[in-house]
From Swiss-Prot:
Residues 514-533, 538-583 are annotated as: Disordered. Involved in cytoplasm to vacuole transport (Cvt), pexophagy, mitophagy and nucleophagy. Recruits mitochondria for their selective degradation via autophagy (mitophagy) during starvation. Works as scaffold proteins that recruit ATG proteins to the pre-autophagosome (PAS), the site of vesicle/autophagosome formation. Required for the Cvt vesicles completion. Its main location: membrane. GO terms for biological process: autophagosome assembly; autophagy of mitochondrion; pexophagy; piecemeal microautophagy of the nucleus; protein transport; reticulophagy; ribophagy. It comes from Yarrowia lipolytica (strain CLIB 122 / E 150). The keyword Coiled coil applies. This is Autophagy-related protein 11. One of its GO terms (cellular component) is Atg1/ULK1 kinase complex. The keyword Coiled coil applies. Residues 552-582 have a biased composition (Basic and acidic residues). Residues 552-682 form a coiled coil.
């Protein structure tokens, strides 16, 4: 069973699979999704020939390439930094020989990895080359379509140019003077001008002058865009060819294989010397360096390949946008061509009408000649070609096509060329040609008329295309394509008809000879022994007898003679009547035979047609049978070969079965030993599983604690048996953070709290389950520790965003409050305080009314009359001032303890126990 290799273009990994493994393309794509982790919707499958994979390719192709659309399209970022693989260097131990063997095993594994990496690099380059090939094919197809549209537009422009120079007034005058030969036949129109729609023709010409240049400008702009696209494509191809052809990775891989071979020779001996140890270390370091170099080369190859594929995707995206524009321009040109053809039909109406007259004349001449000088089938072919040539020009052309039954019987027994009893004479056609104003059209019509001779042989031919040269008249005189009417089947039929005609002539002559022999003697004819005497003979005889010397007749003799003459006359009349009746009977018989002959002729034609059909069916059936016999013979030979092969295979299978029996016995022993090993491994795995379960459960609980510390809580719903998580959500719980910190918080009616209880029974699921319930217990454990990490990350991130938003909001409010405080402070500092003085207030000081004291005391102006006095400073002169505004720099509170006159304790003679303040101020 042959296999097909499927390679991933982004990683270079290749996997082989059986060809008959896949029943459909969806099946193949589902398998690729499992193998390469590329979703079905993002897969692009290409063959080595850069064709999209179809079901038929699975049986013919040896390798398929898988492209990831998300990587090719650039939706997945490929900006990754290279991280070198961490490789362990083995140091020498106490046993150099054992260490050398370990190094050899380790290096062998590294060399195998280098081979695999080299193969993956080659696969990536092949896949990139396939993508480049597909891009070039796409670009070439687009250039080819553009070339076709350009050629089509060039021909259309050449066809439109003469149309724009047509003089419509001259055309109207020329056609107005032409009177139709039979108005009743030509739709009851009197003149050729009645078939024209000059208003429509004028609108088409105006549209060509106004809109067609803009269409050509669009085509020119599109041509420039496609030229730039082709240039960019070629630039990408040239830059990629050198990279694809590089062989640096192969050189590194071959070098690693050579070093491994040298290392194997060093470790082949029983004892490893100190010099060999150094050589082994050197080989080990070289292989490690080569492995790192190849790993870096693969990383660079993947990065470069992704950039190339993304460039290809961008170029194809540009071409995809340009292709509809090219298609739209092509459709516009097609519409212009249809309008051009419609206009040229009216411009060439003189030539079309002349062709109709010439064809009428040719058919009239052919019908009048009886078709003796030409083949009927050739005439049919000529008429069919003429109909195909002119059927889409003007409705009056249909007068030569309607009621035409182009078959052998109708065209040979009637005159189908003279439709509606319309017979055209050569002078009518000649007169019309002389009225045509265009010399080119006149010459073409004269050339066609010259082909209509007196015999009117049906040998005319017509051009393949009507308007290829710009007009009907110019097209008709272009390259001619002869109509072939002679085939082998027709020759055989004509030979059979000639033989049948000869046999019918012989049969007809034989019947006529028999009828003549029967009709030569009528029943009333006298016998040969009696003479039939006419009246003229009797008179001559009488005259002769009167001159003779015979004696005179008696009366009795005269009566007898007259009686005999009367009887002879009556007998002659009866004979003439009988001959006339016989002639009428003969004529009716001839008419009957003519009708019978015509009926026989029709039957003969039917029989000949049936004979030809049966002969064709028999020939076809015979060919099918011969082919079937040949296929059956080949099938028999194949079956005989298969039987021989099956016999040989059966013998080989018996021998192989005996060998397999022995191998199975040995494998059974090995499996018993392996079973014991597996049991030991299972015991070890159970311990590992228990440790891993504990770690997973611990991680799950820590994640839950983290959520609770943020005020979030995970909520899950299980199915009936608790093995599947039906729904999972993370929502915020008010007060949960306070509870987590051990603080108490107030609760509203809508507040809710969640008490999470630890279910440690799920932690020991591996030790409490049986092999039958292992799967269900495992699924239950997974359900218990399930966390939707996408939702987890989303909720935590959103929570942090909310906290950051709240912090920014509070910071903004704090800045606002700080600004307001500063503003209030500034405002306060600029106002004079009246009470509740404090350091920094602006105070108005006034002199007291006790001028006897020296120096005169000053008091602070305030509300409520508390005692605030200004403390004098040395050098300050206030005696000549009426007021002082100063800012308090210091305050000293005092209580009166001394009596009046005590300058230290009561300098202002205040009452005992009264509280007063010394104020130190700086003048503002």
């Amino acid at each position: 069973m042959s296999e097909i290799r499927v390679s991933c273009a982004s990683s270079g990994v290749s996997v082989s699979a059986a060809r008959d493994q896949f029943s459909s393309l969806p099946h193949l794509k589902a398998w690729i999704e499992l193998e390469f982790s590329v979703s079905v919707s993002e897969q692009l499958l290409l063959t080595v020939a850069a064709e999209q994979v179809k079901m038929a390719h699975l049986g013919t192709q040896n390798e398929l390439f898988v492209f990831d659309r998300s990587v090719v399209g650039g939706t997945v970022s490929n900006e990754h930094k290279y991280s070198a693989p961490k490789l362990k260097t083995l140091t020498p131990g106490t046993d150099p020989s054992q260490w050398a063997l370990t190094v050899l095993t380790h290096c062998s594994r590294l060399v195998e990895e280098t081979k695999r990496v080299t193969a993956e690099i080659a696969t990536i380059k092949r896949a990139t080359n396939v993508a480049i090939t597909q891009m070039k094919q796409h670009s070439q197809n687009l250039d080819k379509n553009l070339l076709n549209v350009k050629e089509y537009s060039k021909e259309l422009n050449q066809g439109i140019t003469p149309l724009l120079s047509v003089d419509l007034a001259q055309l109207r005058d020329n056609t107005r003077a032409v009177k139709l030969v039979a108005p009743a036949v030509f739709g009851k129109k009197q003149f050729l001008n009645d078939w024209l729609d000059l208003q429509q023709l004028q609108s088409i010409v105006v549209e060509f002058k106004a809109d067609f240049p803009s269409c050509m400008d669009k085509l020119q702009t599109l041509e420039q865009d496609l030229a730039q696209l082709s240039k960019d494509t070629q630039t990408l191809v040239n830059s990629t060819d050198v990279w694809i052809g590089g062989t640096n990775s192969d050189v590194l891989c071959n070098e690693a294989v050579g070093i491994l071979r040298k290392l194997s020779e060093l470790t082949s001996g029983d004892h490893v010397t100190n010099e060999a140890v150094k050589s082994v270390q050197n080989c080990q370091s070289q292989i490690l360096d080569l492995h790192k170099a190849l790993s870096k080369a693969k990383f660079q190859t993947v990065q470069h390949s992704q950039k190339v594929l993304q460039s290809i995707s961008q170029l194809q995206s540009r071409s995809t946008k340009l292709k509809p524009k090219l298609t739209h321009i092509g459709s516009e040109l097609t519409k212009y061509e249809e309008k051009r053809v419609q206009a040229m039909k009216q411009v060439d109406v003189e030539f079309v009408y002349g062709c109709v007259l010439v064809e009428m004349l040719r058919r009239t001449v052919w019908s009048q000649s009886g078709g003796e000088n030409g083949s009927v089938k050739s005439e049919i072919g000529t008429r069919v070609a003429w109909k195909k040539q002119f059927q889409d020009t003007f409705p009056f052309v249909d007068i030569l096509n309607e009621q035409e039954d182009l078959t052998i019987d109708t065209i040979s027994t009637s005159s189908p060329s003279i439709v509606h009893n319309l017979v055209i004479a050569r002078p009518v056609v000649t007169d019309y040609i002389s009225q045509v104003s265009s010399k080119e059209v006149r010459n073409n019509l004269e050339s066609l008329l010259g082909g209509v001779t007196g015999s009117a042989a049906a040998t005319s031919s017509f051009p393949r295309s009507l308007f290829r040269n710009g007009s009907i008249s110019g097209s008709l005189m272009a390259e001619r394509a002869p109509i072939s009417s002679a085939t082998n089947a027709d020759d055989k039929i004509r030979g059979y008809e000639a033989r049948i005609r000869k046999l019918e002539d012989l049969l007809y002559k034989q019947r006529m000879s028999q009828d003549t022999s029967r009709w030569s003697v009528s029943p009333g004819t006298p016998s040969a022994g009696f003479a039939v005497v006419s009246p003229g003979q009797l008179s001559s005889e009488a005259r002769g007898s009167s001159l003779s010397p015979e004696p005179t007749e008696t009366r009795e003799q005269v009566k007898a003679r007259e009686k005999a003459e009367e009887e002879a006359r009556k007998a002659e009349e009866e004979r003439l009547a009988r001959d006339k009746a016989a002639a009428e009977a003969l004529q009716s018989k001839v008419d009957q035979l003519s009708q019978s002959l015509l009926h026989t002729e029709n039957e003969k034609n039917d029989l000949m047609a049936n004979l030809a059909s049966m002969e064709s069916d028999f020939s076809r059936e015979r060919r099918c049978l011969v082919q079937e016999i040949s296929e059956l013979k080949l099938r028999v030979e194949e079956l005989e070969e298969q039987v021989e092969t099956a016999a040989e295979t059966s013998i080989e299978r018996h021998q192989r079965a005996d060998q397999e029996t022995e191998e199975l016995e040995q494998r059974l022993k090995a499996m018993t030993l392996a079973q014991n090993t597996v049991d030991d491994e299972n015991s070890r795995l159970k311990i590992t599983l228990q440790d891993m379960s504990q770690r997973l459960y611990t991680g799950y609980k820590r994640n839950c604690v983290l959520l609770e510390s943020l005020g979030l809580q995970a909520q899950k719903e299980y199915d009936a048996d608790g093995s599947e998580v039906v729904s999972f959500d993370i929502h915020r719980v008010k007060g949960l953070r306070k509870k987590h910190r051990g603080k108490k918080g107030e609760k509203t009616e809508k507040d809710s709290e969640s008490d999470s209880t630890d279910d440690f029974s799920a932690l020991y699921w591996a030790t409490k389950t049986t092999p039958d319930s292992f799967e269900s217990s495992y699924r239950t454990f997974l359900a218990r520790i399930f966390l939707d990490y996408d939702l987890y990350v989303e909720k935590v991130a959103k929570r942090f965003e909310d906290l950051e938003h709240l912090a920014r909001k509070l910071q903004k409010e704090a800045r606002n409050y700080r600004t307001m405080t500063q503003q209030l402070d500034d405002e306060t500092r600029s106002k004079i305080a009246l009470n509740r003085f404090k350091v920094g207030d602006l105070v108005l000081f006034l002199p007291t009314r006790d001028p006897s004291r020296q120096p005169q005391p000053w008091a602070a102006f305030n509300v409520g009359a508390p005692h605030f006095f200004l403390k004098q400073k040395p050098g300050r002169e206030l005696k000549d001032r009426d007021w002082l505004v100063g800012r308090i720099t210091g305050m000293e509170e005092r209580v009166v303890n001394g009596g009046i006159g005590d300058r230290e304790e009561n300098p202002f003679d205040l009452g005992q126990g009264l509280r007063w303040w010394w104020l130190e101020a700086e003048e503002e």
